[in-house]
Amino acid sequence: MPPKDSKQKKDAGKSKKDKDPVNKSGGKAKKKKWSKGKVRDKLNNLVLFDKATYDKLYKEVPNYKLITPAVVSERLKIRGSLARAALQELLGKGLIKLVSKHRAQVIYTRNTKGTDEAAPEKEA
């Protein structure tokens, strides 16, 4: 192996600035690259009810613990405006119960009284 001290003696006279003539003024910082971001799939929700979805609305939705237009829209794959109208219809028929009504958010829950009345009909 050759001795290393010969190289060290040559470099010892030079300062750090002399070694890097490019970085005298600090150099240019690397540009930040933009992230690609997340791509969402386009929702293809129904604008009007078909027979199967309408039946599903009457069977399943009154059994949900938390019923909001967003929950109904996501589970039944229907538009939000259609979900709001459907929940108004269910409320009118007494299948669900209003918990809180706000300008932007309406919250319903299952009607406990309605299920008690419906249970004896199944037994008979």
Swiss-Prot record:
For the region Disordered, give the residue spans: 1-37
The subcellular location is:
Cytoplasm
Task: Give the encoding gene's name.
Answer: rps25
What's the stated role of this polypeptide? Component of the small ribosomal subunit. The ribosome is a large ribonucleoprotein complex responsible for the synthesis of proteins in the cell.
Q: Would you say which domain of life the source belongs to?
A: Eukaryota
Q: Where does this protein have compositionally biased stretches of type Basic and acidic residues?
A: 1-22
First-listed, main subcellular location of the protein, grouped into a coarse class: cytoplasm
- GO MF term set: structural constituent of ribosome
- Gene3D superfamilies referenced in this protein's UniProt entry, alphabetically: 3.30.63.20
Give the family this protein belongs to, as stated in its UniProt record: Belongs to the eukaryotic ribosomal protein eS25 family.
Q: Which UniProt keywords apply?
A: Cytoplasm, Ribonucleoprotein, Ribosomal protein
**Statement: the UniProt record of this protein carries the keyword Ribonucleoprotein:** yes
**Assembly behavior:** Component of the small ribosomal subunit.
Instruction: Tell me which GO cellular component terms the UniProt record holds.
Output: cytosolic small ribosomal subunit
Lineage, uppermost ranks:
Eukaryota, Metazoa, Chordata, Craniata, Vertebrata
Q: Where is the composition biased (Basic residues)?
A: 27-37
Its name, as the record gives it, is Small ribosomal subunit protein eS25
